[in-house]
């Protein structure tokens, strides 16, 4: 069993937001507060400590009361760059990640990921949901061993950026969540307005 104090939570808010017109998705208002704050309020009770990966508006994220770390790679290099800085700054054996634009993910997300990671002696546990009759992995909703940092850095230094290609190099377990709507995100302003 993995204790939550051995897990650091990371909110991934370092994207370019290109499908939302280039605006900072994590700072967009949802039910009276920024989406990243919703994510933080859901994630913080599930982990020992939390932090944010962001590449702009750092002061706004710092005002949420947790450490904020920008990518070490230039040009909005994608979620793996955020994972890398999270693993570099993580002081616990495990890192849990969630995106900033999904404000309703399950309150037992980390507990369930940790349970399966330990049970199956995996390196990475990822959430998976049923969509159109197919089980679909949600790789940015994951829990991983911080010992994977050298592997990720080598992968990024080779010029690769695809999260699925990196996770495929490790022992992964998918953890099925029945409520696919809990993982609904807002990639566009229209999707943000449609979130319940």
Swiss-Prot record:
Family matches, as PANTHER family: MOLYBDENUM COFACTOR GUANYLYLTRANSFERASE (PTHR19136:SF81)
Keywords, sorted A to Z: Cytoplasm, GTP-binding, Magnesium, Metal-binding, Molybdenum cofactor biosynthesis, Nucleotide-binding, Transferase
Entry text on domains: The N-terminal domain determines nucleotide recognition and specific binding, while the C-terminal domain determines the specific binding to the target protein.
Molecular function via GO: GTP binding; metal ion binding; molybdenum cofactor guanylyltransferase activity
Top-rank taxon: Bacteria
Gene name for this UniProt entry: mobA
InterPro entries assigned to the protein according to its UniProt record, in alphabetical order: MobA-like_NTP_Trfase, Molybde_CF_guanTrfase, Nucleotide-diphossugar_trans
Species the sequence originates in: Bordetella petrii (strain ATCC BAA-461 / DSM 12804 / CCUG 43448)
EC number(s) recorded for this UniProt protein: 2.7.7.77
The protein's name: Molybdenum cofactor guanylyltransferase
UniProt-listed GO biological process terms: bis(molybdopterin guanine dinucleotide)molybdenum biosynthetic process
Residues that hold Mg(2+) according to the record: 101
Subunit relationships: Monomer.
Enzyme class: transferase
